[in-house]
Design a protein with these regions (language model features):
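N-terminal structural segment of carbohydrate-active enzymes
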Residues: 1-97, 105
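Short, basic, glycine/proline-bearing loop/turn elements
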Residues: 61-63, 257-262, 302-303
Length: 492
């Protein structure tokens, strides 16, 4: 049962009884904020939806996406999630569900249909939810997961985009201000402000506006540069939890294999502690809002069992570190087509049979950033260009986001934006002339009853779901700086 609306008390999150509540769970990525690697399409969500509308027509388009949103999370999912001891589901959503760019500041009530449903399902099974605005008008970062069809995060340069986000969060706060199972509002996912100071200034502004409507719920605020950097953050806001994201390159195809060496374990802990310096310095709660490896494909990857065992060992060590410091965490992610989720679609399902050949093509062309596999033919084309740029324009290595090398910038603009969008219609064409029943079967591929579970991953999560008791000697990270250490490492 709920202990009332959660709040921040010192470095803890507590209920009305002042007893600590540690939130641990996963994110429902790919649902109300779709992502290419999660469900299989190329490019960005808005481009995917435009192509699907072109191919299906309005009636079939509306039917399919409503069924998709319905089947993606049902009571069966809530029961399973709760059975693993997990108590918090992060709910990423795209602003497009609530506002039309051609009719701004007019609330689309339809956006709450599925958000309300899942919040209520989670509450029924004693699961808190964190509402996460994952895609903002103009794009808060240059990546696909903000539904940004460019590599320019224009949100930071246009006050009107910022005004619209303040307006939207105020509307959301009106709806959920009395809901004790909503753990709070994650106002911006992975912001990337090249000037740094505008993000904390915007947080100061929106905090006042939201608090005027809902003075009780916690605000969950990501750091800058994909939730890894705290430059120009000079103070903390009341009743606020600050969030980092803690992915490790060792969990991805282009990273080194995790072998459990003392050096690798130290690297994992040091990486986390650097990102947590700001929270440690200010003695606030610590939330790791995203982390987790991707997994090799049994149908495509030789040695997949060994690879996946090492990836889960890596995850287990990260969770051990988080237990040591008794932090809140939300793994990325709950459900997908087989790359990263706790559960995933069955290769024999209608959806997977329809798109599997296209997934092989995407992988070969490196159209998805997440879980990008080596592709010699692509790299033979791209690498000489990258070397040429680095030789003649060495400043290219210093462009923001600073964790991106030149190769990442080039691949993003050529492969993952332009080439991927060129194939949006081809992907949508896979569903051309499907009947309503066939579209329903495709959408139902994501229903819990039709999905497969990643058993060892789920056992590891269950083992770490309950935080260590305070009496067991958990530690508070020590801060030796003001929390402003710069980020210079590569992202997955």
């Amino acid at each position: 049962m709920s202990t009332g609306i959660l709040k921040v008390q010192g470095d803890q999150v507590v209920g009305n009884d002042s007893k600590p509540v540690v939130l641990r769970g996963a994110a429902l990525g790919g649902w109300m904020n779709m992502e290419n690697f999660i469900t299989g399409y190329p490019a960005q969500e808005s481009q995917h939806r435009a192509s699907m509308l072109k191919v299906l027509g309005q009636k079939k388009y509306d039917f399919f996406f409503d069924k998709f949103l319905t089947y993606f999370f049902t009571e069966s999912d809530a029961k399973f999630f709760s059975s693993k001891g997990l108590n918090c589901l992060r709910l990423p959503f795209n602003y497009h569900h609530f506002e039309d760019d051609m009719n701004p500041r007019v609330l689309m009530e339809s956006g709450f249909k599925h958000l309300d449903r899942v919040v209520d399902l989670c509450a029924k099974h004693n699961i808190y939810t964190i509402l996460d605005l994952h895609a903002l008008p103009g794009g808060q970062n240059p990546d696909w997961h903000s539904d940004n069809v460019t590599n320019y995060a224009s949100f930071w340069d246009h006050k009107d985009f910022q005004d619209r986000v303040v307006w939207l969060w105020c509307e959301i706060a009106k709806r959920y201000k009395d809901n004790a199972w909503v753990a709070g509002y994650n106002l911006i996912n992975e912001p990337c402000d090249p000037k740094h100071y505008r993000l904390p200034q915007f947080y100061d502004r929106i905090e006042k506006e939201v608090r005027a409507i809902d003075s009780d719920h916690i605000l969950w605020l990501d750091g800058n540069t994909f939730a890894m950097e705290w430059r120009d953050f000079e103070h903390v806001l009341p009743n606020t939890v600050y969030g980092l994201h803690d992915y490790s390159m060792m969990g991805f195809p282009k990273g080194n294999k995790y072998e459990g060496t003392s050096e690798q374990k130290q690297q994992l802990e040091s990486q986390f502690l650097r990102k947590a310096e700001f929270m440690s310095h200010h003695s606030t709660p610590i939330w790791n809002g995203e982390f987790g490896p991707v997994y090799a494909n049994p149908q495509l990857d030789a040695g997949h069992e060994e690879v996946n065992a090492a990836r889960i060992d890596l995850l287990d060590q990260q969770l051990t570190n988080y237990d040591k410091y008794r932090i809140h965490w939300s793994i990325w992610l709950y459900k997908d087509v087989g790359l990263q989720g706790m559960i995933h679609t069955d290769p024999a399902s209608k959806w997977m049979k329809t798109i599997s050949p296209f997934l092989v093509k995407k992988r070969f062309l490196q159209l998805d950033a997440w879980g990008r596999y080596p592709s010699k033919q692509v790299e033979d084309v791209i690498n000489p260009l990258v070397e040429f740029i680095d030789k003649h324009i060495p400043q290219s290595k210093e462009q923001y986001p600073t964790p991106w090398a030149t190769e990442r910038q080039v691949i993003r603009m050529i492969n993952q934006m332009w080439m991927a969008n060129c194939l949006s219609d081809e992907f949508a064409g896979l569903f051309k002339d499907m009947s309503f029943d066939e579209l329903d079967e495709c959408a139902k591929s994501f229903h819990f009853d039709n999905c497969l579970q990643r058993d060892r991953l789920n056992r590891v999560l269950e083992a770490h779901a309950a935080p260590p008791d305070a009496a067991e000697g958990w530690q508070r990270p020590k801060s030796e700086t003001n929390g402003h250490t710069a980020v210079r490492q590569e992202l997955p």
